[in-house]
Amino acid sequence: MPPKVDPSEKVEVFLRVCGGEAGAMSTLAPKLGPLGVSPKKVGDDIAKATQPWKGMKVSVKLTIQNRIAVPEVLPSASALVIKALKEPPRDRKKEKNIKHNGNIPLEEICKIAKTMRFKSLAVDFKGSVLEILGTAHSVGCKVNGKSPRDIQAGIQSGEIEVVEPK
């Protein structure tokens, strides 16, 4: 039998859930049971925290200390790009492999790049913007009415200047 977990110890658990849904408690139980946390209550907390991300898959970091779980949403770059499109939530059970065809301004891409900077492997901010533009290309949307690939080429050639938002 594994040793008992110290309740005052800080434990972090990472989960991938669909936004706004409580999820299957049976998948949470093996992870949270030994920590002395109720999977049902945690599932409800996660559903509340992920409500703005309804219909999208997002990562959630659960910080558990003294039998209290605090959920923190860690959206991926693609989730931020899709949210910037301001599309209505879709039923993910009925529609699969959705291509998004909206338009995002470059300033919004810069804001997303600033948000994702801590995860980025790029040396400078310009590299982070290029990463987010690649994500926008894979999502299938346009940036300033053009293909994200064209914007990337413009940034690399120096035609388009990228400024970090304050």
Curated annotation (Swiss-Prot):
GO terms for biological process: translation. GO terms for molecular function: large ribosomal subunit rRNA binding; structural constituent of ribosome. Keywords: Ribonucleoprotein, Ribosomal protein. InterPro entries: Ribosomal_uL11, Ribosomal_uL11_C, Ribosomal_uL11_C_sf, Ribosomal_uL11_N, Ribosomal_uL11_N_sf. It comes from the Eukaryota. SMART domains: RL11. One of its GO terms (cellular component) is cytosolic large ribosomal subunit. Pfam families: Ribosomal_L11, Ribosomal_L11_N. Belongs to the universal ribosomal protein uL11 family. This is Large ribosomal subunit protein uL11. It comes from Dictyostelium discoideum. The gene is rpl12.
